[in-house]
C-alpha cells in the first residue's frame, strides 16, 4: 500500500464520503487511490473556487468534512476566497494539497511555492506529512480536528514521494473532542441578568441558529419578551414554518445601530458583538447601543444548544416557545418580474426541507423577508463576504442532501466568479434551481460609492460598476443546463 492509498483508506474509515477535486500532476497518485475507494464519491470542479465552495456547502449541511484535492500552491490559492468563507462559517473541511517530491523542491520548479504560507490564513490547522505512513496519520488528525465543535478548516500537504512511497499503513481514527460547555455559575449569572433586564435581546450565531437551539431561545423570549436576533450573514439558519422566528441584523451600519437602539441588555451566544463591515467617514464601526450591558456568554466553540437549554431552564422559562413561525401564502400582481414579486413566488413555491444558497446581493432583502414564512428550510449565506460562493455552495448542499430541493439565489455579477459550478451541476445531475438576479451592475457598489462620500462620479468610475456591456446573464445559458428567461 502506498501513502496515497493509506491516506484515502484512512479518510474513508473516518467517514469522509466525498472528494471535490481539481487535481494536477502531483496529485495523480491520490487520484488513483480515490479510484480504489468504493465509499468515496469523486466530483470534478473546473475551478478551485468551485471545489472549495462545494466542500463548504457540504460541510455546512452535514456537520462533517468533505475533502478537497488541490494542485500545489497556485491551485490552493485559486480556492482561497471560498476557504475564507468556510473558515468564517466554521465549516468542517479538509484540504489535501499535493506538493513536489521532497527531493525535487531544491530545484525550484515553476510551480514551487510556500504552500504553508498560502494555506495558513484560511486554515485553522496546517500540516505537511513526513513520510508515506505519516500522510495517513495527518489525515486521521485532520478528520478529528476538522470536526472539533463547531468546525475547522484543516489542510494536509502531501509531497509526491509520500503519496507514491510504499509500505504505508492505515492510521487509526482519533476521537473527536466533545463540545465545551458553560459552567453552572455562568449560566445562573446570565439568567439573572436577563431576568432583570428592561429591554433584553439574545444575539445568536453559529449553531445557535439550528431549529432545536432556537426552540430554547423562543422559550426565553416567552419568559421575558426578549428579542431574538441573528448575525447579518449566518452560516446556516434554519427557518420557516414551525421554527422560532428570528430578526436578522441589517447590513448597513447606520441601519444596524437603529435596529439595536433601545436595548438595555444583549446576551451573545455563538456570535461576538457585531461591527460594521467597513469603515466609512462619519459612520459608526461599533454597532451595539451605548450604555447597554453586553454579555458574551458563549463563543462559537461552546455548545450553543446546551447553553440555550440550560439558560432557559435556569430562568424557569415555559416549555412552549414564543414566536413560532406560521406559513403564509402571498398574493402578488402578475406582470414583469421584480425583486418583490419574484421573492413572493419563491416563498410560495419553496418546498419543505429545501436548502437556499443565498448570494442574491442587493435583491436579498426581499427574498429573505418573504421566505421567512415559507415552508421549513435551511438558509446558507456568504458568511465571509467573499463573493463567488453561491453556486458552489449550492453544489455542495445538493451533494450532501440529494433528496432535498436546492435553490440558488444568485446575483449576476458575483455568479460570474464561479460560473464553472454550473458545469458541475449538469455533470452530476444535481437537483438545483438557479434564480439569476439580472442587475446588469454591481448594485451594492453603486450604493457604497455614495456612502463613502463620492458625489457625481464620472464615466470611468461608473464603468467599473456597470455589467450591461455585454450583458453577462447570457453566459449562464451556455453550460448545458435547461433555462427559462
Where are these regions (language model features)?
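Thiamine diphosphate
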Residues: 96, 104-111, 366-479
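Glycine-rich, anion-gripping cofactor-binding loops and their flanking helix/strand elements
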Residues: 60, 206-297, 374-404, 416-420, ...
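N-terminal cofactor/phosphate-binding cores enriched in small/glycine residues
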Residues: 2-81
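Active-site nucleophile and cofactor-binding loops and adjacent substrate-binding regions
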Residues: 22-24, 43-53, 68-75, 130-131, ...
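Alpha-helix C-terminal capping segments
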Residues: 33-35, 54-65, 80-92, 223, ...
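Structural signature of the thiamine diphosphate
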Residues: 17-18, 60-97, 120-172, 190-200, ...
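Phosphate/pyrophosphate-binding active-site segments
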Residues: 133, 270-364, 479
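Active-site diphosphate/adenylate-binding microenvironment
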Residues: 4-8, 12-17, 22-25, 30-37, ...
